[in-house]
């Protein structure tokens, strides 16, 4: 029986010493657009890079191994990954999404619903009635989960929802971007699909846009491969090469991201100017017990609300020096964000109020800097 290695080893060894031509330790970068046919009329593994490429295959093999899947596709962006999942559905399929889902996901599925292509329902999946009543009432074809959510870090019980989904033959897809394969594996909890914006933690260096979709189901895998090629949204070999290089240090990076996040949470929790702190590692966080049960870590993302609201946010952004104000997350550098105008800016003010995102909310992606430097920088900006 082949030995199953730990995640750090899987990431570090992905594709290593696989070059049979020259014996290179690091797998080569195949920048070619096409491949020579062996003979007329004979199918072969690689024909055209949109359809398949060895560099891209090394990356998806590593991610599939880390997530416990059988395969998947590397895409040109996180939203391309979301689009791919949407495209494997039949016309008029019913889809349930979180009421507080990422703005890009909300915009995509809302647009498809407006065109009459899908029937879409945005629902608070943390409510008890979601499991006991809503799923059965809607009888969905796809349930899309974001656990933990952006930016309030709300977790939902992936295992329970997956079990309920099976009663109506629904596919369960989980956006696992915030946790990475290091801290959560949705397929092992019963989900059918796991999706990542590899732009974030998996690449980890803020220099590549990418996405990934991994599955544990053969029929779904066939559809993913067909539609990724058909839509022309597969990732480039060079981006795959850089992402695989970033993936090799994922384990040790996630440890540091989490350590820094926990230190920041501690000082924010004791600051008089802070109204609330949102981090699943806090015992009083509403999703703490679920997160503790299905995650092996609490991650490097957190958010907090300032008592002064938007005025306080503006002051904080102006005064802080170490943390740039920018979109995205999961890179080596710590970043601050304003969900009200950035990730969830697509929503109306009323919708943002409904899902708990105020204009005084700040999101932090804890990077890899020295912990004391981060704390000093944040405290100075607040005080």
Task: Show where each model-derived region lies.
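Conserved N-terminal alpha-helix of the aminotransferase class I/II PLP-enzyme fold
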Residues: 34-83, 87-88, 104-111
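Short gly/pro-enriched beta-turn/loop segments at secondary-structure junctions
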Residues: 24, 237, 272, 296-299
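Conserved PLP-enzyme active-site core in the AAT-like
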Residues: 2, 13, 74-273, 278, ...
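Short, acidic Gly/Pro/Ser/Thr-rich loop/turn segments
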Residues: 36-39, 220-221, 309-312, 343-344, ...
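Conserved C-terminal alpha-helix-loop-beta "cap" of PLP-dependent enzymes
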Residues: 276-362, 366
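Short amphipathic alpha-helical segments
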Residues: 44, 209, 243-248, 298-302, ...
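N-terminal "arm"/small-domain region of PLP-dependent enzymes with the aminotransferase-like
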Residues: 1-53, 59-62
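PLP-dependent enzyme catalytic core of the Aspartate aminotransferase-like
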Residues: 110, 121, 132, 141, ...
